[in-house]
Amino acid sequence: IIMRTKLIKGLSQIQSKYDAFFIDLWGVVHNGIQLYPGAIEVLKNLNNLNKRFVLISNAPRPSKSVEKYLLNLKMDKVFLKNVFTSGEAALQTLKKNVYGKKFYHLGPQKDKDLIEGFEKNKTSLEKCDFILCTGLFENEEISLDYYKKLLKKYTKLKMICTNPDLIVHRGSQSEYCAGSLALAFEKMGGKVVYFGKPYPEIYNFCI
């Protein structure tokens, strides 16, 4: 069977065929700095037609944090009824201690709200049960070689990647995401569990 891709000019061409929509945020609805006016018009149209939609994001943070972020971008809160993030999907699993209790947080301080309430379980690479990867530490640590050296002795640990994206475009700038670190870890022989698009867990949680 040969599957043919049908190109469309806009969602309005197919929206009558579906009851619900999964809509990505970064790069679709906004660019990290501002909302895309055309995308907001689409959301207004879907809302007026009483179509259900979930705004999904590979942000390694709880859904509520992204809701606040979108409000700061001046998004109408009527569109924020269903926001779900890869961080939220990971959090729901981490609460059950599926991968152990003690973790090493590999990521920047801005993602600390993901581990709110779990701070006591944060520990060193030497003592942790698994690595919780939300991204690079801070802007000055932009070389993947730095992280390869850091993780070289710990490939027997499991890494939980809360953002499978390799890079993100913030305005006109490109930045590494947690997915780049996870890919490097896998190439070194480590095992990674991914939460976020395109992996099924985030969609299963939304449903």
Give the residues covered by each predicted segment.
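HAD-like aspartate-dependent phosphatase fold
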Residues: 2-207
